[in-house]
Amino acid sequence: MNQSVNTNIQAKIDEDLSPTKRLTGFHLKIVSAIAIIWSFFQLWYASPFPFMFDFGMFKGLPARAIHLGFALLLAFLIFPTIKKSKVNFIDIVIGIVGISCCLYIYFFYDDLIDRGGVLYVLKYGNYSIPIELIIGSTGILILLEATRRVIGIPLVVIAVCFLLFSYYGQYAPEIISHGGLSLKRLVGFQWFDQEAIFGIPIGVSVDFIFLFVLFGAFLETAGGGKYFLDLAFALVGKTRGGPAKAAILGSGMTGMISGSSVANTVTTGTFTIPIMKQTGFSKEKAGAIEVASSVNGQIMPPVMGAAAFVMASFIGVTYFEIVKHAFLPAIISYIALFYISHLEALKLGLKGIEKDKLPKLKETFLSGLHFLIPIFVLIYLLVYLRLTASYSIFYATISLVSVNFLYKVITSRKNSNLKENLSLWWNETVVGLQKGAINMIAVGVAIATAGVIVGAVGSTGLSTNLIIVIESIAKDNVIILILLTIILCLLLGMGLPTTANYVVVASLMSMVLVDVGNASGYIFPIIAVHLFVFY
């Protein structure tokens, strides 16, 4: 691609589209510092160093509490009450209270375990102060407000409905009714137990998801996004409808390492959509092609969306098993997108981009070989050595930062600017640490709120009652049950992010599908059911 277009790609990718773009001065420095500390905490937690040095080891629940605490604090430091307003002093106070509610679990974890779910009440003279009831209730309310700011109202409404169902269960329709949880039991289960807010979903976020998001952030800041786009244009840019196919291919390659539809769209769409419009695609079709290809990045191995990691923990299989089963559907989906874009180009009579305006394939491929090394490291550790996803992504992330450092040192020999290159590497690394944490705010908050729903289902016996309800509606008709699941996914998907949508529907419907399928003479593998819900 010629120099001006090449520069345009880099400018679009470098454009600050993050939630922190309105922050300035001391406020920005504080947010950046907290984000970097969060990233270092996650790197330490995922590394083998705590076991090697017998220092800094964190148990499951305290680690999850710290993880959510960082997410809540950053959410209130970055996202104001109303989108167009600014963060004020009250927002900062709420953020500090939120992380304090989480850190209470870290500092008093042993006491919580010893009391076996009984909430502590402080005796002060003739007064009894339910300290932990206040802390837990405050934490839940702050989590819901953070979700409203970061994700939106729909997920909050659903979570509140499940909380009300937990408390007022005796007033629900008879077929799903239950005795109702006391406020102490409700708060204790939701905030201080490992089956709800701090359950499996956020545990997966702590163990795997953060580092995969961090890996994608490092790769993007090092120039990986531009490399994959250039490579996509070099491969298919000259074909009929080339920009659309390049958008699909670029989004697919970016999706292999980002696992985020939003990050994918931002990285590739800011450049590919204008190019598609210039070559003849309508703005609606250009946007649709980019969104479809970017969203499909969540199902593209080796780094799928956050829901895939939650799925592995729900089912009790390795992440590699999920990747293995998801690979073929992902390839088929991108082949279908290629075919559709080709038909659109034929219908519109479009041609490809002129060859002299495209990057040369060999030069482009060789220029970014160092970006492929960490990806191969990740695949090798996951697939061949069968290391845990946590260790695999940790070593892949370290290899990415190290390879980028070596690349900067080697290239400095050509331009004799070692100091400048090392400064660039340092800046890319720091920005990667910041972006990784900031990109995780929405994921962490959404997963924690989805945990409210999981906790409500588990504590009220709703899943068992729901099987009876669904069976009475479907009457052992698997097709009707599948259609009900599809409709539920679509309705929730209009307002929920992918991971939250998956957690909610999987909690409600996955075992129902398996049980009704068995009763009807069909054997549905549990992994197939969960992938169906995910897709």
Regions found by a protein language model. Give the residues of each.
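Conserved, well-structured core domains of diverse proteins
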Residues: M1-Y127, L133-S137
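Long, contiguous bundles of hydrophobic transmembrane helices that form the permeation core
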Residues: N2-L28, A35-I36, K324-N439
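Membrane-water interface regions at transmembrane-helix termini and the short interhelical loops
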Residues: T20, L77-V87, S137-I153, S313-E321, ...
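Membrane-interfacial loop-to-helix junctions in multi-pass transporters
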Residues: I129-I134, E195-F208, L235-A247, T279-K285, ...
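Flexible hinge motifs at transmembrane-helix junctions and intramembrane kinks/re-entrant loops
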Residues: L144-G179, I200-P201, A222, K226, ...
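Core transmembrane alpha-helical segments of multi-pass membrane transporters/permeases
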Residues: E145, V150, V160-I175, L183-V187, ...
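Hydrophobic transmembrane alpha-helices that form the pore/transport pathway of multi-pass ion
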Residues: L229-G297, A307, G316, T499-Y535
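Long hydrophobic segments that form regular secondary structure
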Residues: L369-I526, Y535
